[in-house]
Amino acid sequence: MNQNLLWFEKLKFNNQDLIPAIAQDYRDGTVLMMAWMNSESIQKTLSTGEAHYWSRSRSQLWHKGATSGHIQKVKELFYDCDGDTILLKVEQIGDIACHTGARSCFFNAVPIYPQS
């Protein structure tokens, strides 16, 4: 295996051969979205420099923004200490990551009521 891909062997995919991937704005740290990746989408992301995910609903490779134009240019890729989550630091073209038209998919705030 290519020395540059030795890290890939450390990844822990679930029983569907998927791994969660968080997309984060590389400039301000905003968490934009969570999606699933498989080995094919990771390889495609690395070879193109643009985020590719695995669509569980369509069971196919998904080039983020291919239809909308809101592609994600990957600036950095990390994996966590357990090897079971990927973090993509991206430049979000068009400043829209969510299919709802929002910048981030995480716009549903839940109030926290500390217990006394």
From Swiss-Prot:
Mg(2+) binds at residues 80, 82, 84. Its main location: cytoplasm. It comes from the Bacteria. GO terms for molecular function: magnesium ion binding; phosphoribosyl-AMP cyclohydrolase activity; zinc ion binding. Keywords: Amino-acid biosynthesis, Cytoplasm, Histidine biosynthesis, Hydrolase, Magnesium, Metal-binding, Plasmid, Zinc. It is an enzyme of class 3 (hydrolase). It is found in: Cytoplasm. Its cofactor is Mg(2+); Zn(2+). GO terms for biological process: L-histidine biosynthetic process. InterPro entries: PRA-CH, PRib_AMP_CycHydrolase_dom, PRib_AMP_CycHydrolase_sf. Its EC number is 3.5.4.19. Binds 1 Mg(2+) ion per subunit. It holds the Pfam family PRA-CH. It catalyses: 1-(5-phospho-beta-D-ribosyl)-5'-AMP + H2O = 1-(5-phospho-beta-D-ribosyl)-5-[(5-phospho-beta-D-ribosylamino)methylideneamino]imidazole-4-carboxamide. GO terms for cellular component: cytoplasm. Pathway: Amino-acid biosynthesis; L-histidine biosynthesis; L-histidine from 5-phospho-alpha-D-ribose 1-diphosphate: step 3/9. Zn(2+) binds at residues 81, 98, 105. Belongs to the PRA-CH family. Homodimer. Catalyzes the hydrolysis of the adenine ring of phosphoribosyl-AMP. This is Phosphoribosyl-AMP cyclohydrolase. It comes from Trichormus variabilis (strain ATCC 29413 / PCC 7937) (Anabaena variabilis).
